[in-house]
Each structure stands twice: as structure tokens, then as C-alpha cells.
């Protein structure tokens, strides 16, 4: 069992950076990984050569660093910011080229004015005061405060110069920005202090593992800890003198080894972590055991692998209860527990997950349903919209698992530079296994978001086929909508029993079937948010119910951003997927609207969609809300409540701001 005395405090003497404990070749990605774990001896010249190559690589890594950023041997500073990110081996903003490939490619970019750009800044979503942010890092609850760290560029509204931003909150809604937690000041992270995770030791102290990009652009894992464990704000962090604690193992490229997870306890009392990587086109998750977080033993087996999924970033691994609606600490295991493996796919920029079984004895995991394994085309996703690099943590304060995610922009980089900021975080979500289906997760905004609700209006409306109804709620830029829909039973029975109604469930797709304007027998129907009076700009969030070949109904939950803005330098996809609807359930949705972000939750959070939208005229008081039913044959009854939402308290760092937040 790890003892905090072995780690905290670390003596002031300079320790040599540590090599990984295991120097075995990488496991064959085609090898069966669910048998007993066996230590294989090195055999023959191949193994000796592999070991020597690894030692040479490691010696070169340590010996050649000069302790500072290298412009001539590291990243080419003459490259654009975008290519800097790709050269470094991480994802960056990819929208600039996309709109130019659309029908607007021959048209000059839209001319945004300051009023439009100012409106895009959110009121109750977390984002830095200015400049660029991306991945959530090391979220935790400590001494009465929620801590949120994040990838941050303090110098510009584009990716680069990454450090760890830091903010604290009492309730996950109201925040105070704190000074930067960790900067790129060592050779092993001089090209960026990248994504990492926090682990609580048995005595309540904290260790933080994070990826550093070295002065030679090699991805290594590093250890840090609070300078003063008695400081509830955790203002200062100390990097372990022996960093890096892990370097890329044999067979792994220098830029394919990043984003360590929160550690969990094994049955032997060791700590275990997993780190994302790839072998050729196969996405993999490496596994390491440690006792003191300084030295590590690499397991011969992989936690999991899926061919043709590419690089796995920001891997997350955690238990969920099969029977209860509460969250579980990361180390919990047992017969009533399933485990989630989630990976952020560098190739597609989607966060995929699967439900499965974890084997503590050899550190492997298998999915319950191999046909929807992590990263496969048909696999499950946390969110079917703009949602990436997510990170969960166990909130011991309320016994729940909370999920954060980076919500990037869908506009051009030039617009980001003009407005002076880029990206934000989604509203934190609770995440549990859907105990009704046992096959998927359910996500829901944390309960604290309700504290921002102001005035509300309730509606019960019957909406006939082809109808659009204005919903009188005043300005619709900051809303929380909870709605329940029911298709008229007579219409439903008539369509199900009518052989002439085309079975379309197998062919329908939110993304490819034309959006909310394409009419079917039973849909689409829902809300148009951030709409102008004339509907020239609108973002529909809707259900589409399709009849299958067996006359069974299949329900889809979609968001159509194709008409969200008349601007031509914006990517405007149609998002969505099928949503499970059980017998006897009505169709339900919740929508959070906060200026340029729309978060939608179908059927209690079984299917979620986050969108970034940039209207040019549906802003300020001109932003409206509409209810619509574009079905051909069905009447729909909608019962819903709309709340106006207050702004969150998100302030710069000062003693007074911290005191004010302490009083909430």
C-alpha cells in the first residue's frame, strides 16, 4: 500500500530522473490479453537490441536536454500555431479549412463586429478571462473547494505555450480564477504542461501526474504535488525533482504517449494508471503499476486496444454501479460494478466510451458488447456534438462522478483572435450507468445549475403537423428548458399499422438525412432556439421518430446548426444519434442555452448533444424561442417549462473575490 510518507514531502536533494521499471517490448496488439499475466524473459538478440535501443533513447533524452526551449532542434517556431500543435503531436483547432470546403468557399469571410462577438461570450459556462483553453485537467474537491485545472495559453487566443490554468468554486457554478498552477519551466515540460489527473492518497494528500512535452518534443509523464497541503486553494505546486517518471516505452513513438489517468488501487495494494497511445492504427491504453508514484512497472498486457481507431487521447477509466444511482470512487470494484473505458479519438475528435468488465489480476478490460467497442463507428459517445478531451472525477463531497469537457469553437481562428478568447467548458455533468437499460451511461447537468434559474413559464400546447409556434419568454439567450412530448395515440396507431408508410428507421441519420426541414410521418418536432422572428437564423433541437421494417419505432435526438448563422466562416453540422426509449416512456428533453453554446439532453441524458452556434441577428433581445412540429401526419402535445437563467459569478483572482465566494 502506498504511503504518503514515501512521497510527501520530497527531500530537496536532486534525484536522477527515473526510468520505467519494465523495459519489455510492447505487447503484440493481436495477442489475447485476458489470460493470466506472465512476465516474459528477454530472448535472443532481438530482445537485447530492443533493450539497448530503449536505453540509448532514454540516455539521449536525459543527456541532451539543455533546460530551455529549443527553437532550432525542437518545434519550428516559424510554423503557424496550428501546425505547431500537429508537430507537437496533439489536436488543435481544425475549423479554418472546413468552411472553405463548403459552398461558401469562394465567398469572403463574414465581417463580424464587436457587438456580435461580445454576445458570444457565455454567462454561466466556465471559461478563462481571455485567450485559449482546451482540456480539463485534474478536477478535484479539497477542503471545501472544487478545483478545476485546464490547458491554457496565457498569451493568445490560439493553441500554444500551454500551462495549467486554475480556478476554484464552492458549487461548480460560481468561480474565481487563481494564478497559473504550473508553467513550462523545466526541460521535461518546456514545450507544454499538458493534460493530467489527480489522485488522493489514503491520508487525503494529493498527487498530480501530467504529460510534459520536452525541449525535444518528446511526451513524458511527470509528478507534481501541492507545496502546502494545508492551503485549501492549492495555490502553489511543486514538481518532483526526479521528473520525468515515465518515458515512451519501446515500440511507442515519442509523440504518442500522453494523458495519464487518475490512479486506482489494485487488489495487491498497488496503484495503477493507464495512458493512451497507439500502435500503427490501433488505439491502445498502456497500464502501469506503482507504489510511490516515482517508479513504475509496465504490465505486459494492455488495458484495451481497438484496431483502426488511431491515437487514444485523454483516456478515462472508472467504475459505475449496476444497481445504484450514485457515483463510485475510482478504486471501487466488485460484482455489482461495471467499468467504463473512454478514449478521445485524435483522428475524429469524438469521445467514445464502452461499458465492460475489468480484470484486476492482469489489468485488462473487455466490452460487454464488442460490436460497439470504444471508437468503432457504431460505438457510444458521451456527446454527439462539439465535446472533446473530457475528464471525470469522483466528488467525495456529494458521492457522485462529475464529468468535465472541453467545448471548442466552430468559428474561424481569425474570429477567435478578434474576440480575444477561444473555447469553454461544458456544464459539469453527473454520470451514472443507466440502470434501466444496463447498456449506456446517463449524463445530467449538476444539480447546482438550478440555482441560476430565475423567472419561469409553463406551457401545455398541442401542435399540429407543419406548425411553428412562438414561445413568449422574452429574450432567449440564457434559458433552461425542460420538456415532455407525446405523439397523439390515434396518429401513432394509424402510422404503425399502415403498410404504406415507408419504413425508414434503418436509413435515417441525424447527420445525413437533411436536418429539421425534412419531413417524415412522425417528425421532426422540438424547439428552435436562438432564432430570429423570421426564422432566418435558428438552431432546432428535436426528436425524429422513424418506423422500422418490423413496425417498431426508433427515436433519434438531433440538433441542426445548419441555419444557426448566416455567417459563412462557421462550421454548421447536424448532430445527433438514436436515443433509447423504453416502453411506456414519454419523450423528454432538456436544453441549456447560453449565448453561443446549446447543450441538449435527450431521455434524461441517454443521448447528449453540445453545439456551438454564432448567430448574427438572433442575439441580445432579438433571440427568440419557437416550438415546431414538422411531422407530416402526427399531432404532438408538448408540456414544458422555460426558465430565464442568471449569470454565474466568475471573477478574476483577488482576496475579496475568494472571500465573496466563501460566503456563498
From Swiss-Prot:
<feature type="binding site">
    <location>
        <begin position="194"/>
        <end position="195"/>
    </location>
    <ligand>
        <name>substrate</name>
    </ligand>
</feature>
<feature type="propeptide" description="Removed in mature form">
    <location>
        <begin position="1"/>
        <end position="108"/>
    </location>
</feature>
<keyword id="KW-0326">Glycosidase</keyword>
<dbReference type="GO" id="GO:0016020">
    <property type="term" value="C:membrane"/>
</dbReference>
<keyword id="KW-1015">Disulfide bond</keyword>
<dbReference type="InterPro" id="IPR013189">
    <property type="entry name" value="Glyco_hydro_32_C"/>
</dbReference>
<comment type="pathway">
    <text>Glycan biosynthesis; sucrose metabolism.</text>
</comment>
<feature type="binding site">
    <location>
        <position position="313"/>
    </location>
    <ligand>
        <name>substrate</name>
    </ligand>
</feature>
<feature type="transmembrane region" description="Helical; Signal-anchor for type II membrane protein">
    <location>
        <begin position="44"/>
        <end position="64"/>
    </location>
</feature>
<dbReference type="Pfam" id="PF11837">
    <property type="entry name" value="INV_N"/>
</dbReference>
<dbReference type="GO" id="GO:0005774">
    <property type="term" value="C:vacuolar membrane"/>
</dbReference>
<dbReference type="InterPro" id="IPR023296">
    <property type="entry name" value="Glyco_hydro_beta-prop_sf"/>
</dbReference>
<feature type="binding site">
    <location>
        <begin position="258"/>
        <end position="259"/>
    </location>
    <ligand>
        <name>substrate</name>
    </ligand>
</feature>
<dbReference type="GO" id="GO:0005773">
    <property type="term" value="C:vacuole"/>
</dbReference>
<dbReference type="GO" id="GO:0005985">
    <property type="term" value="P:sucrose metabolic process"/>
</dbReference>
<keyword id="KW-0865">Zymogen</keyword>
<keyword id="KW-0378">Hydrolase</keyword>
<feature type="short sequence motif" description="Critical for endoplasmic reticulum export">
    <location>
        <begin position="9"/>
        <end position="10"/>
    </location>
</feature>
<dbReference type="GO" id="GO:0004564">
    <property type="term" value="F:beta-fructofuranosidase activity"/>
</dbReference>
<feature type="glycosylation site" description="N-linked (GlcNAc...) (complex) asparagine">
    <location>
        <position position="280"/>
    </location>
</feature>
<feature type="binding site">
    <location>
        <begin position="132"/>
        <end position="135"/>
    </location>
    <ligand>
        <name>substrate</name>
    </ligand>
</feature>
<dbReference type="InterPro" id="IPR050551">
    <property type="entry name" value="Fructan_Metab_Enzymes"/>
</dbReference>
<dbReference type="Pfam" id="PF00251">
    <property type="entry name" value="Glyco_hydro_32N"/>
</dbReference>
<keyword id="KW-0735">Signal-anchor</keyword>
<dbReference type="InterPro" id="IPR018053">
    <property type="entry name" value="Glyco_hydro_32_AS"/>
</dbReference>
<dbReference type="InterPro" id="IPR001362">
    <property type="entry name" value="Glyco_hydro_32"/>
</dbReference>
<keyword id="KW-0812">Transmembrane</keyword>
<feature type="short sequence motif" description="Critical for trafficking from the trans-Golgi network to the prevacuolar compartment and from the prevacuolar compartment to the central vacuole">
    <location>
        <begin position="14"/>
        <end position="16"/>
    </location>
</feature>
<comment type="function">
    <text>Possible role in the continued mobilization of sucrose to sink organs. Regulates root elongation.</text>
</comment>
<feature type="topological domain" description="Cytoplasmic">
    <location>
        <begin position="1"/>
        <end position="43"/>
    </location>
</feature>
<feature type="glycosylation site" description="N-linked (GlcNAc...) asparagine">
    <location>
        <position position="362"/>
    </location>
</feature>
<keyword id="KW-0333">Golgi apparatus</keyword>
<comment type="similarity">
    <text>Belongs to the glycosyl hydrolase 32 family.</text>
</comment>
<feature type="glycosylation site" description="N-linked (GlcNAc...) asparagine">
    <location>
        <position position="113"/>
    </location>
</feature>
<keyword id="KW-0256">Endoplasmic reticulum</keyword>
<feature type="binding site">
    <location>
        <position position="151"/>
    </location>
    <ligand>
        <name>substrate</name>
    </ligand>
</feature>
<feature type="binding site">
    <location>
        <position position="159"/>
    </location>
    <ligand>
        <name>substrate</name>
    </ligand>
</feature>
<dbReference type="Pfam" id="PF08244">
    <property type="entry name" value="Glyco_hydro_32C"/>
</dbReference>
<keyword id="KW-0938">Abscisic acid signaling pathway</keyword>
<feature type="short sequence motif" description="Critical for endoplasmic reticulum export">
    <location>
        <begin position="7"/>
        <end position="8"/>
    </location>
</feature>
<keyword id="KW-0926">Vacuole</keyword>
<dbReference type="GO" id="GO:0000325">
    <property type="term" value="C:plant-type vacuole"/>
</dbReference>
Amino acid at each position: 500500500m502506498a504511503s504518503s510518507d514515501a512521497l510527501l514531502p520530497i527531500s530537496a536533494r536532486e534525484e536522477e530522473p527515473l526510468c520505467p521499471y519494465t523495459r519489455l517490448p510492447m505487447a503484440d496488439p493481436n495477442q489475447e490479453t485476458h489470460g493470466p499475466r506472465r512476465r516474459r524473459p528477454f530472448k535472443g538478440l532481438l530482445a537485447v537490441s530492443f533493450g539497448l535501443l530503449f536505453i540509448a533513447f532514454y540516455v539521449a533524452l536525459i543527456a541532451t536536454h539543455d533546460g530551455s526551449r529549443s527553437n532550432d532542434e525542437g518545434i519550428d517556431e516559424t510554423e503557424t500555431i496550428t501546425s505547431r500543435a500537429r508537430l507537437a503531436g496533439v489536436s488543435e483547432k481544425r475549423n479554418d479549412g472546413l468552411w472553405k470546403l463548403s459552398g461558401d468557399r469562394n465567398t469572403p469571410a463574414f465581417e463580424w463586429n464587436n457587438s456580435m462577438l461580445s454576445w458570444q461570450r457565455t454567462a454561466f459556462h466556465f471559461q478563462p478571462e481571455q485567450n485559449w483553453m482546451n482540456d480539463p485537467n485534474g478536477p478535484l474537491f479539497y477542503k471545501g473547494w472544487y478545483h478545476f485545472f485546464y490547458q491554457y495559453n496565457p498569451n493568445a487566443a490560439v493553441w500554444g505555450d500551454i500551462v495549467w490554468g486554475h480556478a476554484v468554486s464552492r458549487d461548480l457554478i460560481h468561480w474565481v480564477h487563481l494564478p497559473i498552477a504550473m508553467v513550462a519551466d523545466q526541460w521535461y515540460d518546456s514545450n507544454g504542461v499538458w493534460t493530467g489527473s489527480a489522485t488522493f492518497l489514503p491520508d487525503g494528500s494529493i498527487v498530480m501526474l501530467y504529460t510534459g512535452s520536452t525541449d525535444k518534443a518528446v511526451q513524458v509523464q511527470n509528478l507534481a504535488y501541492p507545496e502546502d497541503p494545508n492551503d485549501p486553494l492549492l495555490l502553489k505546486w511543486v514538481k518532483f525533482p526526479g521528473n520525468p517518471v515515465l518515458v515512451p516505452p519501446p515500440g511507442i513513438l515519442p509523440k504518442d504517449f500522453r494523458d495519464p489517468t487518475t490512479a486506482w488501487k489494485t487488489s495487491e495494494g498497488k496503484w495503477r494508471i493507464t495512458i493512451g497511445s497507439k500502435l500503427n492504427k490501433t488505439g491502445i491504453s498502456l497500464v502501469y503499476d506503482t507504489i510511490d508514484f516515482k517508479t513504475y512497472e509496465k504490465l505486459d498486457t494492455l488495458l484495451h486496444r481497438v484496431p483502426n481507431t488511431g491515437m487514444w487521447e485523454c483516456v478515462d477509466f472508472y467504475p459505475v454501479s449496476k444497481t445504484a444511482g450514485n457515483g463510485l470512487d475510482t478504486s471501487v470494484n466488485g460484482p455489482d460494478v461495471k467499468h467504463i473505458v473512454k478514449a478521445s479519438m485524435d483522428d475524429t475528435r469524438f469521445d467514445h466510451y464502452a461499458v465492460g468488465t475489468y480484470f484486476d489480476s492482469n489489468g485488462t478490460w473487455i466490452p460487454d458488447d464488442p460490436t460497439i467497442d470504444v471508437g468503432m463507428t457504431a460505438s457510444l459517445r458521451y456527446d454527439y456534438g462539439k465535446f472533446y478531451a473530457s475528464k471525470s472525477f469522483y466528488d467525495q463531497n456529494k458521492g457522485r462522478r462529475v464529468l468535465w469537457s472541453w467545448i471548442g469553437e466552430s468559428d474561424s481562428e481569425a474570429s477567435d483572435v478578434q474576440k480575444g478568447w477561444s473555447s469553454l467548458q461544458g456544464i459539469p455533468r453527473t454520470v451514472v450507468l443507466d440502470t434501466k437499460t444496463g447498456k449506456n451511461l446517463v449524463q445530467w447537468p449538476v444539480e447546482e445549475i438550478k440555482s441560476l434559474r430565475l423567472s419561469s413559464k409553463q406551457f401545455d400546447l398541442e401542435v399540429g403537423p407543419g406548425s411553428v409556434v412562438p414561445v413568449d419568454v422574452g429574450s432567449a439567450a440564457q434559458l433552461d428548458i425542460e420538456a415532455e412530448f407525446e405523439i397523439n395515440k390515434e396518429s401513432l396507431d394509424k402510422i404503425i399499422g399502415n403498410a404504406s408508410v415507408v419504413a425508414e428507421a434503418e436509413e435515417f441519420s441525424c447527420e445525413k438525412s437533411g436536418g429539421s426541414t425534412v419531413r417524415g410521418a412522425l417528425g421532426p418536432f422540438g424547439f428552435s432556439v436562438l432564432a430570429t422572428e423570421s426564422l432566418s437564423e435558428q438552431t432546432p433541437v428535436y426528436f425524429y421518430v422513424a418506423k422500422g421494417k418490423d413496425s417498431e419505432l426508433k427515436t433519434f435526438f438531433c440538433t441542426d446548426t445548419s441555419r444557426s448563422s448566416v455567417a459563412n466562416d462557421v462550421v454548421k453540422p447536424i448532430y445527433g444519434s438514436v436515443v433509447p426509449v423504453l416502453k411506456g416512456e414519454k419523450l423528454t428533453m432538456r436544453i441549456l442555452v447560453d449565448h453561443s453554446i446549446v447543450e441538449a439532453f435527450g431521455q434524461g441524458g441517454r443521448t447528449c448533444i453540445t453545439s456551438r452556434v454564432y448567430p448574427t441577428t438572433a442575439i441580445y433581445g432579438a433571440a427568440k424561442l419557437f416550438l415546431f412540429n414538422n411531422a407530416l401526419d402526427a399531432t404532438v402535445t408538448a408540456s414544458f417549462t422555460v426558465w430565464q437563467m442568471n449569470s454565474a459569478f466568475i471573477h478574476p483572482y483577488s482576496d475579496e473575490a475568494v472571500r465573496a465566494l466563501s460566503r456563498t
